[in-house]
UniProtKB/Swiss-Prot annotation:
Catalytic activity line of the entry: RNA(n) + a ribonucleoside 5'-triphosphate = RNA(n+1) + diphosphate
Protein name listed in UniProt: DNA-directed RNA polymerase subunit alpha
Pfam families listed in its UniProt record: RNA_pol_A_bac, RNA_pol_A_CTD, RNA_pol_L
Gene3D superfamilies, sorted: 5' to 3' exonuclease, C-terminal subdomain (1.10.150.20), DNA-directed RNA polymerase, insert domain (2.170.120.12), RNA polymerase, RBP11-like subunit (3.30.1360.10)
Assigned EC number: 2.7.7.6
Alphabetically ordered keywords of this record: Chloroplast, DNA-directed RNA polymerase, Nucleotidyltransferase, Plastid, Transcription, Transferase
Role according to the record: DNA-dependent RNA polymerase catalyzes the transcription of DNA into RNA using the four ribonucleoside triphosphates as substrates.
Species for this entry: Elymus canadensis (Canada wild rye)
Family statement: Belongs to the RNA polymerase alpha chain family.
Lineage of source species: Eukaryota, Viridiplantae, Streptophyta, Embryophyta, Tracheophyta
Length: 339
């Protein structure tokens, strides 16, 4: 973090991307400014964004590889230049881009002699490779070589205990961190009471996200993190009241669909997309990964269907309810449960 004195002034709070470049397929760079900020605010925003960018952004990577009858990860395979451990390290470096949630399967199945690169990975439709030239192994003899892979979307650095798996599979320490580095600097402007600060934020990513996309996701994650405090204030409930609050049985979205059709028969539900409902990014992403794209898709789901979605929470359910009430002028109060 760097702090400097510069001359200049701005009137309204605004942010701007002042530089953006692609250094390579796996290295994107972006530089942003936010101003004007009161003294001390730039540090607050800079620290929070840096932590969120480095620790809260989700990424997709290979988490497990199965070779077949390989006794241990330090083994060598006849006809392959690299050891099993070296292949695992190469797989760990593969950068993937996707919107998937949960675990997916992938595979490699080739015949030598030839070089194996990331381009040879057979992926599910929702996953793509950022750099297809990333090396995996070199087959020096005419052998058939197959690997079963496991792909997962997560955040941060995930480690697994090394176990002797009988099926020949080996865990890979996953680095689900699309943001490679973040730096911020603060510049002070003006004199006396007119003094304010400008925050400069530099972001480097691995190509699975652009710096602008990473900044947006980090900002949304920070907003979602503080939403419970705002909701508690709006509802006027104390900690003690919340602690002893009873959660009522869940409503069914099928009932809402029935009521919606009765009250608004002319609404083309399949033409109303969830993008139009002003959902939080968290709730929106939960629905998207379950292939819920329209209001008809949403209202056709049962409560159990939604709660089976990975990371879908009770707060998301309430947020969907409140949003639908806000945007759809229908009489559902008789079916509404208290929260």
């Amino acid at each position: 973090m760097v702090r400097e004195e510069v001359a200049g002034s701005t009137q309204t709070l605004q942010w701007k991307c002042v530089e953006s470049r692609v250094d390579s397929k796996r290295l994107y760079y972006g530089r942003f400014i936010l101003s004007p900020l009161r003294k001390g605010q730039a540090d607050t925003v800079g620290i929070a964004l840096r932590r969120a960018l480095l620790g809260e952004i989700e990424g997709t990577c290979i988490t497990r590889a199965k070779f077949g009858s390989v006794p241990h990860e330090y083994s060598t395979i006849a006809g392959i230049e690299e050891s099993v451990q070296e292949i695992l390290l190469n797989l760990k470096e593969i950068v993937l881009r996707s919107n998937l949630y949960g675990v997916r399967d992938a595979s490699i199945c080739v015949k030598g002699p030839r070089y194996i690169t990331a381009q040879d990975i057979i992926l599910p439709p929702s996953v793509e490779i950022v750099d297809t030239a990333q090396p995996i192994a070199n087959l020096t003899e005419p052998i058939d070589f197959c690997i079963d892979l496991q792909i997962k979307r997560d955040r941060g650095y995930q480690t697994e205990l090394r176990k002797n798996y009988q099926d020949g599979s080996y865990p890979i320490d996953a680095v689900s961190m699309p943001v490679r580095n973040v730096n911020y600097s603060i510049f002070s402007c003006g004199n006396g009471n007119e003094k304010h600060e400008i925050l400069f934020l530099e972001i480097w990513t691995n190509g699975s996200l652009t710096p602008k996309e990473a900044l947006y996701e980090a900002s949304r994650n920070l907003i979602d993190l503080f939403l419970p405090f705002l909701h508690a204030e709006e509802e006027g409930t104390s900690f003690e009241e919340n602690k002893n609050r009873f959660t009522p049985p869940l409503f069914t979205f099928q009932k809402r669909l029935t009521n919606l059709k009765k009250n608004k028969k002319g609404i083309p539900l399949n033409c109303i997309f969830i993008d139009q409902l002003e959902l939080t990014s968290r709730t929106y992403n939960c629905l998207k990964r379950a292939n819920i794209h329209t209001l008809l898709d949403l209202l056709s789901k049962t409560e159990e269907d939604l709660l089976r979605i990975d990371s879908f929470r009770m707060e998301d359910r309430k947020h969907i309810w409140d949003t639908l009430e806000k945007h759809l002028p229908i009489d559902l109060l008789k079916n509404k449960l208290s929260f």
